[in-house]
């Protein structure tokens, strides 16, 4: 099968990011042209190191650019309590000498977009700082973005504060800018990602699959979004799944605003499902997931990896 969808992946690895990067690399329908890193699950130095380790593990020459070290206006609050201090605890990667590109992520994204023969899809599975910087410095690039598919937000409860999902809550000002940008946005939030569980039976079969399965199994043993006994949530993998298997998701056009001021609600995505605010829709929001179909696709794409 010829890859037909050219993508740029912005990420903050992160254990579930590792699974998403594997899918982005090895799903035959996708052509991954650039990876950029951002501070989120851990510091940007660590997310960059982790992404480079993964690319070395897979012997991939995909270019990688390091991005923002802090949110636009706030100090970084990370998720090392979920992913471990390194961000990818549980597997001993081989040392390598590879370095990121000598330019920041938002400039690397601009360069790829402006040199592409047609608009490209951005996939953001961390805080939206790099995407906001791109739009702030190079607003003309919006015409070269086919759509933005993101893992973030929630139409209901949060996983970082009572109402806010982690990726949005880390940099709500960046997220607010992105949702106001006019980009075509597909939002895969907690409403679907909390359903995206890999079962214990599925997890136990990973080591026999291939060396990627062995590596991911080792990482999942240290992942604190679920457990090997009850299943683990593949939040970031949902964004990649939508690219390849959109029929697995139920989407609704909604107006989405990001709260930036509330003492208790900063980072909340206000998803106007019933249209009460009278604002035009600015996102396609995923609200339900075919879990069995998702698991089948994950098994298929992991089997494509070495």
Swiss-Prot record:
Keywords assigned: Glycosidase, Hydrolase
List this protein's GO terms for biological process. purine nucleobase metabolic process; purine nucleoside catabolic process; pyrimidine nucleobase metabolic process
List the GO cellular component terms. cytosol
| Annotated Gene3D superfamilies | Ribonucleoside hydrolase-like
Q: Which InterPro entries match?
A: Inosine/uridine_hydrolase_dom, IUNH, Nucleosid_hydro_RihC_nonspecif, Ribo_hydro-like
Instruction: Tell me which EC number(s) this protein carries.
Output: 3.2.-.-
Report the Pfam families cross-referenced here.
IU_nuc_hydro
Q: Which CDD domains match?
A: nuc_hydro_IU_UC_XIUA (cd02651)
**Can you provide one Gene Ontology molecular function annotated for this UniProt record?**
purine nucleosidase activity
> Which residues constitute the catalytic centre?
235
Q: What is the similarity comment for this entry?
A: Belongs to the IUNH family. RihC subfamily.
This chain's function reads:
Hydrolyzes both purine and pyrimidine ribonucleosides with a broad-substrate specificity.
UniProt name for this protein = Non-specific ribonucleoside hydrolase RihC
Q: Which gene encodes it?
A: rihC
């Amino acid at each position: 099968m010829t890859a037909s969808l050219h993508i740029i992946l912005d990420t903050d690895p992160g254990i579930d990011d590792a699974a998403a990067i594997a899918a982005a690399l090895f799903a035959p329908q996708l052509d991954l042209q650039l990876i950029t890193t951002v501070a989120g699950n851990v510091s940007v130095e660590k997310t960059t190191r982790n992404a480079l380790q993964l690319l070395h593990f897979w012997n991939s020459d995909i270019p990688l650019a390091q991005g923002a070290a802090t949110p636009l206006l706030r100090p970084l609050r990370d998720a090392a309590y979920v992913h471990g201090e390194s961000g990818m605890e549980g597997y001993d990667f081989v040392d390598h000498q590879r370095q990121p590109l000598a330019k920041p992520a938002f400039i690397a994204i601009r360069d790829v977009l402006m040199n592409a023969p047609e608009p490209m899809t951005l996939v953001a599975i961390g805080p939206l700082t790099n995407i906001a910087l791109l739009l702030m410095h190079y607003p003309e690039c919006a015409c070269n973005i086919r759509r933005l598919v993101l893992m973030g937000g929630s139409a209901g409860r949060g996983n970082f504060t009572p109402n806010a999902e982690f990726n949005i809550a880390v940099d709500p000002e960046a997220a607010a800018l992105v949702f106001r940008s006019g980009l075509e946005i597909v939002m895969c939030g907690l409403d679907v990602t909390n359903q995206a569980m890999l079962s214990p039976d599925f997890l136990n079969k990973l080591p026999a699959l291939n060396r990627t399965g062995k590596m991911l199994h080792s990482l999942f043993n240290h992942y604190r979004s679920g457990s090997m006994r009850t299943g683990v949530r593949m939040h970031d993998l949902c964004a990649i799944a939508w690219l390849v298997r959109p029929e697995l998701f139920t989407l609704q056009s909604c107006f989405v605003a990001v709260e930036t001021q509330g003492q208790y609600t900063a980072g909340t995505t206000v998803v106007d499902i019933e249209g009460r605010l009278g604002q035009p829709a600015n996102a396609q929001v995923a609200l339900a997931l075919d879990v069995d179909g998702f698991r089948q696709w994950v098994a298929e794409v992991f089997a494509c990896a070495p």
